[in-house]
Regions:
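Structural motif
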Residues: 6-11, 34-39, 73-79, 106-109, ...
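Conserved nucleotide-sensing/catalytic segment adjacent to the nucleotide-binding pocket
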Residues: 30-83
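C-terminal accessory "lid"/substrate-recognition subdomains
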Residues: 140-205
């Protein structure tokens, strides 16, 4: 099972981003797009793709780690962010699944205008491997440059990329390949520990 988590407020752009990834990538297998139920969602219009609307207040995330499939989970921007991520991380740990990538799609136009939204996105980016800078048409170029530099000065390891047009990622391969770059370890599975002492191991009572 390949699983990806996406966060952001411009859901039309996120939808286009996922559809672009599905159409341009082979070997994804069965694809399920899990999105907040209150939002209409544009499908990629491909046979192997199914939409899975969910209620963030009642959803229980259950996946088969051995299934040859791909899941995209879009976090609800109107529901408590940290609560959703903690619930998701707990459910995924029970399934023994780590997301291959956690992605934040930044609405640059709205973020430039709102300090509150900038704080929300900063929280998202703390958990992210990749940050996609989107909806830049009406955002100041200096703001977009300074926004990225802000996180570089803080030594955030996440990768910053651009969304072009309606939401097409410039480097789709970077979104789908494994390789965590996130600061948070919330989604990391704990390392397995042996049930019995290894040979030569001394256990003190």
């Amino acid at each position: 099972m390949k699983l990806y988590i996406l966060m952001g407020t411009h859901l039309a752009e996120i939808s286009q981003c996922i559809n672009h990834l599905v159409k341009s990538t082979k070997d994804l297998g069965e694809v399920k797009i899990h999105h907040p139920a209150e939002y209409e969602w544009a499908s990629a219009s491909q046979d192997q793709v199914s939409l899975q609307p969910y209620d963030p207040d009642t959803v229980l995330w259950v996946f088969d780690p051995d299934r040859p499939a791909t899941a995209f989970i879009v976090v609800d921007p109107k529901t408590d962010l940290i609560g959703q991520l903690e619930h998701l991380a707990d459910n995924l740990a029970k399934c023994q699944i780590e997301p291959l990538k956690v992605v934040t799609c930044v609405d640059c136009e709205r973020t430039e205008q709102s300090a509150k939204l900038r704080a929300w996105y900063e929280a998202c980016i703390y958990y992210s491997d990749v940050v996609l800078l989107g909806n830049r048409q009406n955002a100041g170029k200096s703001f977009v440059r300074e926004y990225q530099k802000h996180f570089e000065r803080l030594c955030y390891p996440c990768l910053f990329l651009l969304l072009k047009g309606a939401g097409n990622p410039t480097q789709p391969g970077e979104l789908l390949t494994s390789g965590p770059r996130r600061i948070s370890q919330m989604f990391d599975l704990p390392e397995s520990t042996p049930d019995e002492p290894l040979p030569g191991m001394v256990i003190e009572a």
